[in-house]
Amino acid sequence: MNVSSAFQDFQTTVNASDEQVADARERRNLFNAAFGGEQDVDKVIPSGSLARGTQKDPIHDVDTIIVFKAEEHPEWGSPGSSAEDALNHTQQRVNALLGGNGTHEAGRVRYTRWRNHAVKCWLDPTDDPDAFTVDAMPALKRNGHLLVPEAVSEKWIECDPEYLIAAVKQQHSTWNKFAGSVRMVKAWAAEQQGVKIKSLVMEVLALDLMPLGKTQPVAIKEFFVKAAALVEAGLPIDDPADLCGPIQPDLDYALFADRLRSAADDAGAAIAAQVNNNEAKAIKLWGDVFGSSFPSPPASAGTETVAAPRTVKDNPQG
C-alpha cells in the first residue's frame, strides 16, 4: 500500500454506498412527484449535500424544498405566526399525500415532526440502524431568492441553496476529486471530539480554500493550512450566497482553529514523509489526521511497499 492507494481506500470508506444513494434519490423523487402536482406548489427543488454530490457515509437526511405559490398563501413571508403556519401546512400535506391514507402513495411516511425550518419525515422503522429522513422545507420565491420560515424567531429568512449547488458543480467539473475531497474533510470534522462542526461549515471552507488540480493529499494538506489560518484570524464562515450570515454562530472558533492547525501540521509532515519516500510513515500520519477509519500502514513499516494505484470512480452522487 502507498499513500495513493490509502486515499483511494479511504474515499471508499467515506462515500455513501450506491444502495443508500439510490434509496435517497428515490425518496427525493417521491416528494418531488407528490408535491409537483399540488395546486399551490410552484416547484420542488432538491437541496442539501445529496443535491451537491458531497454527502458522506452515512446519509442522515435528504433535503427537499417545496416552493409554494405566493398568491396562494399571501399571508406567508411576513413576521409572526406565518412561519409556523407554513410548517403546519407542509406537515399536513405530507401526511395527506404520503401518510397512512395518503392519496399519492399511502404509507410511505410513518410520522412527521416539524423543526425550525423544515418538516422532518420518517420513512423507516424506528429500529432500522440505516434509517434516514426526508426534510421538507416550505419556501416562497421572492426577488430571485427563496424565503424560508424560521419558527424560533417567527421570521422568514432569505437564502439561495441553488447557488451552492452550482458552485460545487463548477469546482467538481474543474477537478473531479473535489466532491470526494469535501467528503473527506467532512468526515474529519465528524471525528472531532468536544467541538460540534456543521458539515456545511467544512463544505463552504472547501469551496473557498480547497486547491484544484493537485494530488488529493497535497490539496487536502493545503486546505487544512489555509483553513487554520482563516479560522485563527477570526474570520467568520458565512453563507456563500451572502444572504444568511454566519453558518454556525455557536461554533467554538478557538477550539476549531486548534483542531485545524493540528491537522495541518500532521498533513504537512505526511507530505514531507511521502516526498522522502517513506510511504508507511506518511500513511501513519494521515491516520493521525483522519482517525482510525483511514487505512493503517503496512506491517513492515520500515520497508517501502509501492502498489499500483487502483482505479476508483468518484462519480457525483447527487
Residues covered by each model-derived region:
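Terminal (often C-terminal) interaction modules
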Residues: 1-6, 239-318
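N-terminal regions immediately upstream of nucleotidyltransferase
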Residues: 1-59, 70-84, 317-318
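Catalytic cores of NTP-dependent nucleotidyl/adenyl transfer enzymes across multiple folds
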Residues: 19, 25, 98-237, 314-318
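A short, glycine/Asx- and small/polar-enriched loop/turn
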Residues: 58-62, 130-132
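Short beta-strand-to-loop capping motifs
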Residues: 66-70, 210
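Extracellular/luminal regions of secreted and cell-surface proteins that mediate adhesion/ECM remodeling
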Residues: 72, 234-236, 275
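A generic, well-ordered mixed alpha/beta core segment in the N-terminal half of proteins
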Residues: 78-99
